[in-house]
Each structure stands twice: as structure tokens, then as C-alpha cells.
């Protein structure tokens, strides 16, 4: 479960990022860690399950909480960036524990919002 208190987001995270997964909630990028290092998660920005519609409004220092079968961790937002849809650099493994959130940029299909938060 992913919680973003400043945006009133409380969403279950499923494995995978296909359209059927994102129709239910947020989706974990299967090639990234679910716990140690970089855990990358995608979500829709509009429609019935638009849990990530406002992530571009997050501020540095806002908190994100991720609960998995391994426990609960709290993260602090360190960056919010608009990136190219082909930029996969934020999916790379990291030494520090972090969560990276992705969603589409409304009406700009070539771009994505990417939010990085590190464990506190």
C-alpha cells in the first residue's frame, strides 16, 4: 500500500504496470526492487483510478509511506521532474532505499512526471 498524506492518496500497489493492473491501482515496475534500493511505481493521472494525478504538485520534504509484506518504510520527496517517456534512468538500482513514482503528463504523451523520495 502506498500512502501520500499531502495528496490524500492511499492506494494498493499491484505487481506489473500494464493497463489491467493500473485500472485497479498503482503498479510496481517488476524489474525494480520491492524493498531494498529503488522501488519504482506507476499510476494513472486521470480517469476512474487517477491516484497519481497530482504527484507533480508534491514538494521536497513531503512524505510517502510504502507498506509491503516486508514492512513499512517512510520516504521524503527529494525531487519532482518532468522527463521524457524514453528516459529509464530513474528505474536503475540505487544504493539508498528510495521510491520513485511515475505518471503521464496530461496532454503531453512524450513526457512523464517522476517523483523520487528517499527513506528517512
Give the ranges of each region predicted by the language model:
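Solvent-exposed, non-transmembrane regions of membrane-associated and secreted proteins
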Residues: 1-120
Amino acid at each position: 500500500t502506498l500512502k501520500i498524506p499531502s495528496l490524500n492518496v492511499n492506494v494498493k500497489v499491484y505487481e506489473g504496470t500494464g493497463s489491467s493492473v493500473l485500472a485497479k491501482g498503482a503498479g510496481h515496475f517488476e524489474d525494480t526492487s520491492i524493498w531494498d534500493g529503488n522501488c519504482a511505481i506507476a499510476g494513472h493521472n486521470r480517469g476512474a483510478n487517477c491516484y497519481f494525478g497530482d504527484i507533480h504538485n508534491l514538494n521536497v520534504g513531503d512524505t510517502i509511506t510504502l507498506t509491503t509484506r516486508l514492512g513499512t518504510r517512510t520516504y521524503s520527496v527529494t525531487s519532482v521532474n518532468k522527463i521524457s517517456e524514453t528516459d529509464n534512468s530513474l528505474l536503475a538500482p540505487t544504493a539508498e532505499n528510495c521510491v520513485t513514482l511515475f505518471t503521464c503528463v496530461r496532454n503531453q504523451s512524450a513526457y512523464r512526471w517522476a517523483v523520487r523520495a528517499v527513506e528517512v
